[in-house]
């Protein structure tokens, strides 16, 4: 009987050790190019390559083609483009990446559902202020940003944990898309209900 108890303890210790082992990131190979070959652009490229090794971004990578461009606004298409902001903050840099990939979720996987999603978002959150910095300056894309920013938050929670993810969202709420991020922070459950109705997920 004591031997069985000891064996059980050993098996439990082994199981805990296996669960605790760091998992190897499985991010697909990213095709990252710099627009001008500038040192700061190369630094941003290296940052993204490092983050792709540190975190498993497979679930959050729809397009693998990434352009790094000084002075550009981050945008998702036709090629996902990241600027040089957040070189000193990995969490914010990572959030910018998953944010732009979130646009690809809507473009590639939910294109046919987008009209109904827009109507539901507009009905659920009427009178959204769309002028910058509250929105992005355009009605439809400001409403779609509610979905994209929620996808961003979900991804960040999975990658860096709820506490750090919330800090990112709170920082962004003070920086840009302030009305959109405020909706997420104050009405998260309602936002998620809308997304669930239309199958918006990673």
Descriptions of predicted regions:
Residues 81-98:
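Short pre-active-site segment immediately N-terminal to the catalytic Zn-binding motif
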Residues 2-11:
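Bacterial N-terminal signal peptides that target proteins for export
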Residues 157-202:
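Pan-zinc metallopeptidase signature
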Residues 25-78, 86, 142:
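Auxiliary, metal-adjacent structural segments of Zn-dependent hydrolase domains
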Residues 56-68, 112, 159-170:
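Surface-exposed patches in mature extracellular/periplasmic domains of secreted proteins
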Residues 90-91, 95, 107-145:
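Post-HEXXH active-site segment of zinc metalloproteases
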Residues 20-22:
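N-terminal signal peptide c-region/cleavage motif recognized by signal peptidases
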Residues 102-106:
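Short active-site segment of divalent metal-dependent hydrolases/proteases
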């Amino acid at each position: 009987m004591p031997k069985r108890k000891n064996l059980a303890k050993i098996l439990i210790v082994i199981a805990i050790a296996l669960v605790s082992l760091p998992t190897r990131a499985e991010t697909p190979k990213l095709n990252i190019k710099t627009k001008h070959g500038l040192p700061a652009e190369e630094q941003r490229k290296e940052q993204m390559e490092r983050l792709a090794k540190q975190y498993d971004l497979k679930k959050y990578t729809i397009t693998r083609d990434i352009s790094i461009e000084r002075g550009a606004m981050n945008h998702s298409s036709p090629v996902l483009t990241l600027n040089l902001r957040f070189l000193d903050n990995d969490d914010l840099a990572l959030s910018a990446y998953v944010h732009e990939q979130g646009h690809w979720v809507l473009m590639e996987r939910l294109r046919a559902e987008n009209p109904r999603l827009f109507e539901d978002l507009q009905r659920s959150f009427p009178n959204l202020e769309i002028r910058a910095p509250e929105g992005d300056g355009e009605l439809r894309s400001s409403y779609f940003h509610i979905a994209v920013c929620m996808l961003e938050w979900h991804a960040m929670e999975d990658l860096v944990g709820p506490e750090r993810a919330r800090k990112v969202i709170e920082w962004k709420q003070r920086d840009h898309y302030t009305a959109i991020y405020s909706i997420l922070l104050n009405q998260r459950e309602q936002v998620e209900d809308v997304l669930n109705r239309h199958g918006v997920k990673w």
